[in-house]
Amino acid sequence: MSAEKISISLPKELYRELEDFITRKGIPDRSKIFQIALRNYLDENREGTEIIYGIINLVYDHEEASEALTEIQHEYKDNIISTLHLHVNERLCIEAIAVKGEKSKLVELNNRLGQIRGILKARLLISFPYEKT
């Protein structure tokens, strides 16, 4: 793979944190960290009508959120591929929802889920591949 070289400036504290991380993890290639971070940033901020795949990660109190969560998931049944549900303790659950659709629709779904009472975390993680619509 051909590559372009660039130079960046970091605040000293961020640089120290990066160097400490690289040392602790034994990472031999600093460039790889920046490539992954940049790819994630570009994916999350991409505009357009591509069909994307992703995971919506939820942490929630099932006593407060389950009913509304199920209702919204049924509204987006065409975008939800699969779900994985884990019990953390008596009240808290983690749910990973595999999704596919236009980014705007998946962001809308994530935002609606995040507004449910009892949802402690709702995050859309965008994955590959992209399909042109």
Curated annotation (Swiss-Prot):
- Pfam families the record matches: NikR_C, RHH_1
Native species: Saccharolobus islandicus (strain L.S.2.15 / Lassen #1) (Sulfolobus islandicus)
- Which UniProt key words apply to this protein? DNA-binding, Metal-binding, Nickel, Transcription, Transcription regulation
Q: How is the cofactor bound?
A: Binds 1 nickel ion per subunit.
A GO BP term here is: response to nickel cation
A single GO molecular function, which one? DNA binding
Instruction: Report whether Transcription shows up as a keyword of the record.
Output: yes
InterPro entries registered for this protein in UniProt = Acetolactate_synth/TF_NikR_C, ACT-like_dom_sf, Arc_rbn_hlx_hlx, CopG, CopG/NikR_regulator, Ni_resp_reg_NikR, Ribbon_hlx_hlx, TF_NikR_Ni-bd_C
Q: Which family does the record claim for this protein?
A: Belongs to the transcriptional regulatory CopG/NikR family.
Q: What is this protein called?
A: Putative nickel-responsive regulator
The UniProt annotation places Ni(2+) binding at H74, H85, H87, C93
| Stated role | Transcriptional regulator.
Q: What cofactors does this protein use?
A: Ni(2+)
